[in-house]
Each structure stands twice: as structure tokens, then as C-alpha cells.
Amino acid sequence: MDKLIITGGHRLDGEIRISGAKNAALPILAATLLADTPVTVCNLPHLHDITTMIELFGRMGVQPVIDEKLSVEMDASSIKTLVAPYELVKTMRASILVLGPMLARFGEAEVALPGGCAIGSRPVDLHIRGLEALGAQIEMDGGYIKARAPAGGLRGGHFFFDIVSVTGTENIMMAAALASGRTVLENAAREPEVVDLANFLIGMGAQIKGAGTDTVVIEGVKRLGGGRYSVMPDRIETGTYLVAAVATRGRVKLKDTDPTILEAVLLKLEEAGAQIDTGNNWISLDMKGNRPKAVNVRTAPYPAFPTDMQAQFISMNAVAEGTGTVIETVFENRFMHVYEMNRMGARILVEGNTAIVTGVPCLKGAPVMATDLRASASLVIAGLVAEGDTLIDRIYHIDRGYECIEEKLQLLGAKIRRIPG
């Protein structure tokens, strides 16, 4: 199993490009199943979850054509089976996203209950109830979700999400695109990745209004055609490198990103003392060698502060001036990295859904273990600011969400290398 070794104490300085967003790419890949002609998806990140999704399609008979830049042409007309098997689904929660498109396009689907990061209870109930609102008949059997559309196909309906769900909104929006009649989704997720999926569907001929608000209206169409689409930049990868620069008192410029989808994070980084400049597709940040100031954050669904950034801010606060609190309202069990960071000399107290972080002058390198995707990133940041060497084990979590993380950090001057397992 690969490990990362980081020699801390070096300010980040330089420029890198940001990859396509995994959390936009996965639903967009799933949505290619809705098209009856080939679709090309560009700007895909080189990540394990992406290759797993492409492998899943291959197992189902869809033969992807991949070029050297990881643009993928998908043609769902060659599909041979409507079963998403457990051995692929178990490693990736997002595979649930094929349920809605398969059901809408082919009238049936069989998808194993998903895996992915073990963060709290992430139920699939909303997906099931939402699809039932469109007329689907669904049963759970042997660890599989087995779904059938009624005779004549799915029909438009009204569905209220009692909990905001990004993948739930995406799954039902995709299914509704080919349902007959109008579907109204209330308390829908507003994340930019949902908007990116809607724009992709609209490009194929779907009729969707309100994406990015809490009410999405879909007028079903009879068919969706192919096309070419470039996935949006990854806002969480963007935020992670910005926080790493702040924690190391450095200076970076990030290209091929979008500052408008990261406003809550940028405001907090300015509060921490960063000087930030932005353009249409770039962000520059300069700490001018200063120690960051501790900030308070509270996670909530978009457009508020993202849960996927709280672990990184805990790392920044750990070496900041003062005390900052981080309140997690989206997922439970999302402070598992704190105990590893305390072993590095951090002063972090967890009380329920709140982490109270008192900054220390510096952390000490230590062997640590990654527990989930974003926690892994926080340990990398901790390693960058620590004295001595930090060895991070179980970095397959990092590889699920960050493309070439050690190479990008090396471009910024970090002393980091991968040790093959």
C-alpha cells in the first residue's frame, strides 16, 4: 500500500492547474446513459473513482473510447446488461447515480448498495423515494436495489427532499429528464456540480429550469442526443491548495479554476490574513510570509461553507494565531483526522459536532493514517507545516479525490514523495 512522506517547513510558492471536478464528472458520466447517440466528456480528472465508473460501464457493455487527455466518448446504445455489480459498486458510492438514468432510458435497473467513504449514515432512501414519486417500483433484494419503470415509462411527479441531497437531486433530475410530463423537485441541492450536470443535460436536449436554486423543474423529453461537454473545475481541490498555501505562509496561483463557486472559502481565507486576487479562471493568494489567524467556520449545504473543506481548515487553524471553532452540521463522524493531528502536537478538542482548535507555533512530524478522503488532505497540510518528516499511510483515500497530489505540491516547492507499497 502506497505511502506519502513529507518533509515540512517549506512555503508553497508557484502555479498549478486545477483538475476537473470528480463530483461533477461522476454524475455527468452516469448521465451519458440517457443519450441515444455518442457523447464525449472532457476535462475528466485522473482519479480512481473515474476509472471505476468507466470500468463499470465497460462491464455493462458500454465501450468507452478514451484519449490520452482522459476525454471519454460513451455510446450507451451498446449496453448489454442493466446490472451494476457489487464488486465495482462497493468501492464507490457515486455508482448509485446510474440508477436513475438506466431506469429512465431502459425501464429497469439493478444496482448494488454502494460503498465509498465511511462518513456517518448516507442513506439511499431519498433516491428510492424520489424515483418512486416518478412511478418506479423498487425493492431491495440481496444487497441490490432492483427498480422497474411502469408500462409507458417514468412519469413526472412532485418530490420534496426532507434532507438536502446532492446525489439524490442529481439522480432524480436525470431520471425526470426522460419521464413523461413535468417533475418538480423541492429543497433540491444547489451545489455547482448539480448546475454542471443540468447544463450537460440541457446540452443534450433536456428541459430543466431552476438548477442552482432549491426548486428545480424538469419537463420530460422523448430523447436526449449526444454532444461534447467539458467538466467544471474542482472547487474542493482549489480550496485545498489555497489552504495549504495559507498554512505554509506561501504564495500560489491556481489556473483553470472558477472563483465564483468558492466564495465562502475565499472569504474565510481573507479573514485568516490572505491577500487574494481573482480572474475569470484563476485565483492568486499571498500570505506575505505571515502566520494565519484562526477562523471560525460552520459547514452547511451550498452556498454556505462546504463540509468537504472543514478538515483542511482544522489543519490551518492548528498552526494559526488564536483559537478557532469548526462546527460540522452536514455529516457525523467527520473529525476522525483530529486524533492523528493531535499526535503531531496539535491542540484540538472535539465536543459533539464541534472542533475547538487552539493554534500552536508548529506541529511535529509523525507517522499518521488517513481515514477518509478530506481527512487525508488535512494530514498532508499538517505534514507540510510540521517540523521533520510525516509519513501518511492508507493514501488510497487521497487518490480517490486528488489528481497527482504529490506532483502538484512538488511544483509548488513542497518536499513530498510517494513510497510505493
Swiss-Prot record:
The active site is at residue 117. Its EC number is 2.5.1.7. The lineage of its organism: Bacteria, Pseudomonadati, Pseudomonadota, Gammaproteobacteria, Pseudomonadales. Phosphoenolpyruvate binds at residues 22-23. SUPFAM superfamilies: EPT/RTPC-like. The keyword Cell wall biogenesis/degradation applies. One of its GO terms (molecular function) is UDP-N-acetylglucosamine 1-carboxyvinyltransferase activity. It is found in: Cytoplasm. Cell wall formation. Adds enolpyruvyl to UDP-N-acetylglucosamine. This is UDP-N-acetylglucosamine 1-carboxyvinyltransferase.
